[in-house]
């Protein structure tokens, strides 16, 4: 359902983003698809997960090519690591700062949204320094 959900969401929100594009020239409308490293390479026992993530990456690339010329910033963001949320508070790691801060993710997403049209980023990774990739 990963790519299907992204497809339906994109289909619903892109007309709204196109409407707001001219009203907000300083910060172009931004659509960020959050994904995982599985979008780049599959892993053993993760075929169904990787398939959905590969499809989401292709969807975001296609939408970026279709709607980028119309001023819509479409990004495929890879989050690779454990996010430091209440559900993962008790998870212990060998190194400090091994979990990704939600605030750091938000800062990165805000940076994407505030990029000028002359230098859109279409794909990027967020991972802690100690993540093996």
Where are these regions (language model features)?
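Short acidic, glycine/proline-rich loop/turn micro-motifs
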Residues: 44-46, 87-92
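C-terminal helical subdomain
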Residues: 69-72, 76-84, 91-133
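Catalytic loop of short-chain dehydrogenase/reductase
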Residues: 18, 22-55, 61, 65-68, ...
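Hydrophobic positions on the long internal alpha-helix
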Residues: 9-13, 17, 60
